[in-house]
Amino acid sequence: MKHPGLLDLSELLRGLKPEVRPGSFVMVSTNSQSGLQALASVDEDEGTSMVLEQHKADAFRLEYSSVFAWITLTVHSSLDAVGLTAAVANTLASAGIPCNVLAGFYHDHLLVPRDRVDDAMAALSRLSASVPEDDVPPASLESF
């Protein structure tokens, strides 16, 4: 079954509908995945980077440097959509909020510092509300 998702940047931004996933999350790098159930992972030359629930990383005594909140952009974005990641990253960067983006088949997910999640949600809400209904992205997004 094909699930193409939205391609139009204006539609994507208007429909962001960010939601905070309950919990606290960390990113670790390990060469041993024994017993670990990552929520997301990337195999790199240096080891496997994994996103884990903080309590699971603590149980395995894994080192991490930051604790994140997980925000899901519930809009169904196409894997071929252009500009969504850039618009979101630019918005959060303008607010001084670090962001790590994970792209899923249906949705994009953001890891932001746990103590900045409210700021991130407010910035994303402003971004979504700033896109007029006539499909013209705000001037700040024209370069994307």
Feature map (PLM): residue ranges:
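Generic beta-strand structural signal
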Residues: A69-I71, A95-I97, D108
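A short linear hydrophobic-aromatic micro-motif
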Residues: Q37-A38, G96-V101
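Helix N-cap motif at beta-to-alpha junctions
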Residues: E53-A57, P113-D118
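Charge-rich, low-aromatic oligomerization/scaffolding segments with amphipathic character
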Residues: Y64, V117-V136
